[in-house]
Amino acid sequence: MQITRQADYAVRAVLHLARMGTRDRAATSTVAKEQNIPPSFLAKIISQLSIAGLLHTSRGARGGVTLARDPKDISLLEVVEAIDGPIQLNECVGNEGTCAFDESSPIKPVWSDAQEELVSRLKSTNFADMIAQK
């Protein structure tokens, strides 16, 4: 399992906005330039994050992008899943009937535990904590 480049860009964009605070708007061109994100990629990412309720967008001369919630209320998991969908290490975790291993296989609980730990870590990590770490 690998977090996609698009999800990585989304995390960087939200982190950029979190550093600005919830009231300040950022032009998407500024976010793209400062975070080295291709503008066409960023437009799609912002749309997905807006649909997920993580960002507010506004058009026009005074438009831009802002966080929809306080950085402490946005988890890393929410951003990644808004872009990549639910975290799934492999087909043996979460999808009944699609695993090549027998249900009694000793590897299945290892995959399940690893996924639970990853999801838990991403869920417990919020953007306020990340910007505080610098």
Predicted regions and their residues:
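Residue cluster at the C-terminal edge of the helix-turn-helix DNA-binding motif
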Residues: 51-54, 82
